[in-house]
Amino acid sequence: MSYLFTSESVSEGHPDKVADQISDAILDHFMVLDPHSKVACETLVTTGQVVLAGEVKSDAYVELQDIARDVIREIGYNKSAYCFDADSCGVLSAIHGQSADINRGVERTAPEEQGAGDQGIMFGYACRETPSLMPLTLDLSHALLEELARIRKEELHLMPYLRPDAKSQVTVEYSEEGKPLRIDTIVISTQHDDFIQPADATAEAQAIADAEMQARITEDIRRILLPRVLARYPEDVQRAFDSETKLLVNPTGKFVIGGPHGDTGLTGRKIIVDTYGGKAAHGGGAFSGKDPSKVDRSAAYAARHIAKNLVAAGVADEVLVQLAYAIGVAEPISIFVNTNGTSHVSLSDAEIAKLVDEVFDLRPYAIEQRLKLRAPIYRETASYGHFGREPRKVTKYFSTNSRGDVAHEVELFTWEKLDYVDTLRQRFGL
């Protein structure tokens, strides 16, 4: 019997994502000035206010207020009508030094023996539902909002009422064997200007104006947004959007009040959006604001890198990888692999895990080096998912007080590279 499965995403203007992006932008500035920085930065955003907290060990000095305001401005919160404006919001910092007790468990005389920054479990996942080897429900949810933001920033004349905050949700019908059959429901809630005024002050006139706005936005989503997003996908996905697919746009009827004025945002509150949309397990640790000595982040990236390369190599059609660490210990405590019955090799999942341990050095320092994580690469991860993204080289520019304007070439999303496929095929005899 077929079944339905759903994932959601949120836009860069969602309050929790505003917080994530500020935290990661601050991390990037520390990384560009001192790649050995230890950073744990948390952000809270609310009406007219940003609060920064956390722990840092670094030789760098960064302008926290300027960074926060730049991020807010780039997202699009640049009008006083939003009640959260880059130029007028307050920015308070309570960031202080890192605990010496934590640091003594991480730093070692030999860098390769660097201990894990904390205990914990981390998961990586890959499947064959999309070209990016990500779940279709989440991939579509991200794509819808990424394109909506692009329209808002680059082609605003098409949907001139758009504001930064938005959410999406995609439900897909799957076969009993777990293959996507059709897109059942798409939900999009997007913040907008109050662009149709009521004829008079009555509640009835307001309801009519609200209904007209909702109808206009729904039509624009159907006519402009959906065709652009579906065109990115193979024909089988395009066919999955059929005449029976339900489209729900701003189901409450109106979404004018939004962003940090509508809801308080916090770093690390969208961990399922950041990862696999509920299709795979999550260890519970958030990513944003954390330097790669925190295995919550770096080991989760390594686990995705392993899972994606295993699937791309043909070892299995679906792979879940779990890693576990103890604080201050370099080697992982355990490595677990689950292929969910989709393996194409004559090995048990436990035997696959043993080969993974032989092929990949999973000590924190080795992960940092292999994936080039001691670099200012994190702001880009903080919206539209950390996984399923296109690895690429870019030059990023930073304004600093100590070194002026700095240009830095980096590789983004290195954990998405399929650079171990040949090695794995050889080791698994494929």
Which role does the model predict for each range below?
Residues M1-A40, V421, R427-L430:
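N-terminal, positively charged regions that mediate nucleic acid binding
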Residues T6, D66, R73-I257, G388, ...:
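Glycine-rich, mobile lid/loop segments that gate access to catalytic sites or pores
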Residues E8, E12-M31, A126-R150, K290-G314:
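Alpha-helical support elements that line or immediately flank enzyme active sites
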